[in-house]
């Protein structure tokens, strides 16, 4: 089919986002944080999503159940939780539904083997087709996260020729090593389909963007048709973050009697606080007094197994403090989010763990953008990502490379010495907001308010 070469005209955007308004997840926040700026620019959105999130009342927001059994079970659990909480009714109803769907899920997995959410593309496509044929849509915008949104967008593009723009959150093709460019056909059926979908996006989308230079680079290597005539125009956008808790400026830091190193967010074997605990061993040996003065705080997630093992092996039960998820404080009335912001601003140093997998070359943690709003020093332990390293250096962060034990130990020693002298690095106030992302997207797709039909 011929590519629609005309510039984007018209403000009626159909936004396909499987996890829209879904319990604070990064895949949801990435699009929901853009909405105020899109509205301000004159966009008139209609959103299609799964039933897993909270319905938005500012504009048409249609929520559809996925048609496949695995996705139905997933969506049903979240819907029941949103409606009735996770009490006895949740346990009984979701248990019964899971039991009834088990054989059908097994059949779906055996014959297809895709991610559970794939089937949400079907209702999104059917309802999107009706809107487009009714002349109620000027542009289709798929964003994810879940690739079912992109599949629905692809079908709508092929069937109607509507303008289609694509926001890819995480790389669709996961490489295994620096030498792996992603050309090899995966054995996993879901990975194989994602590889196919990436090729289709670069061929049929009008514009497509990724969130890192690395992701754009490797997608271009695999799809040299990108940015050529009658193919997709590809570019990079930094997603940024809204000021957490309404932060608009950094506060003066008050040193306490402890050096508080704070990590916020999820942990895993490839993103583990054991990296920090291992580096504390030589620090405590060289500066014995530091053992009583250094504390590592973990907020927002359970400890990973490597961290738990390191605590046990080193006897660090008093060194690492696991706070878990911060909920609303009934005494003060502060929300969990407000409490998190307070803890971030009170930290001496914020820990940013990047990971050790190859996909780190194409990924920047969303937490990085939140950290920038706090005005606190960041200690980034990164892996194969010059773009992230450059942004950290630009802001006078402490920087180490994953796997470099000596470099990590040296950075920790520098933090200790700086703290002891009350001279921790003073980061430059250079936050990256969501507004700049929306402005770049609108500029790249050449959308102007005066073009509204």
What do the predicted segments below correspond to?
Residues 299-301, 305-341:
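Nucleotide-activated donor-binding/catalytic signature segment of Leloir-type glycosyltransferases, i.e.
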């Amino acid at each position: 089919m011929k590519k629609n070469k005309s510039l984007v005209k018209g403000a009626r955007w159909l936004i396909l986002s499987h996890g829209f308004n879904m319990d604070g997840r990064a895949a949801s926040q990435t699009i929901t944080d853009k909405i105020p700026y899109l509205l301000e620019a004159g966009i008139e959105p209609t959103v299609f999503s799964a039933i897993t999130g909270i319905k938005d009342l500012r504009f048409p927001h249609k929520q559809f159940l996925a048609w496949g059994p695995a996705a139905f079970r997933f969506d049903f659990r979240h819907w029941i939780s949103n409606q009735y909480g996770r009490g006895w009714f949740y346990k009984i109803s979701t248990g019964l539904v899971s039991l009834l769907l088990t054989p059908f899920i097994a059949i779906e997995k055996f014959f297809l083997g895709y991610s559970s959410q794939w089937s949400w593309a079907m209702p999104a496509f059917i309802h999107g087709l009706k809107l487009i044929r009714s002349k109620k849509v000027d542009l289709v915008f798929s964003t994810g996260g879940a690739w079912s949104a992109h599949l629905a967008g692809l079908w709508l593009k092929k069937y109607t020729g509507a303008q289609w723009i694509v926001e890819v959150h995480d790389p669709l093709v996961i490489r295994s090593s620096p030498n792996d460019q992603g050309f090899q056909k995966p054995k996993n059926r879901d990975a194989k389909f994602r590889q196919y979908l990436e090729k289709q996006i670069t061929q049929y989308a009008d514009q497509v963007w990724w969130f890192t230079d690395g992701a754009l680079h490797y997608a271009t290597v695999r799809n040299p048709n990108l940015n050529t005539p009658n193919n997709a125009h590809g570019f990079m956008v930094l997603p940024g973050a809204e000021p957490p808790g309404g932060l608009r400026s950094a506060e003066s830091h008050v040193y306490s009697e402890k050096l508080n190193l704070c990590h916020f967010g999820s942990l895993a074997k490839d993103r583990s606080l054991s990296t920090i605990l291992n580096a504390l061993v030589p620090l405590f040996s060289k500066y014995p007094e530091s053992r009583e003065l250094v504390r590592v705080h973990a907020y927002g997630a359970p400890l990973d197994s490597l961290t738990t093992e390191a605590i046990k092996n080193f006897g660090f039960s008093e060194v690492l403090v696991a706070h878990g998820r911060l909920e609303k404080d009934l005494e003060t009335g502060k929300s969990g989010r407000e409490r998190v912001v307070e803890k971030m601003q009170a930290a001496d140093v914020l820990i940013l763990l990047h990971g050790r997998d190859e996909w780190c070359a194409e990924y920047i943690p969303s937490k990085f953008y939140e950290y920038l709003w706090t005005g606190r020093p960041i200690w980034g332990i990164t892996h194969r990502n010059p773009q992230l390293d450059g942004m950290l250096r630009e802001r006078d962060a402490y920087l180490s490379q994953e796997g470099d034990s000596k470099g990590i130990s040296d950075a920790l020693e520098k933090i200790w010495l700086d703290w002891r002298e009350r001279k921790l690095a003073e980061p430059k106030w250079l936050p990256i907001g969501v507004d700049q992302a929306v402005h770049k997207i609108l500029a790249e797709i050449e959308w102007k308010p005066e073009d509204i039909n």
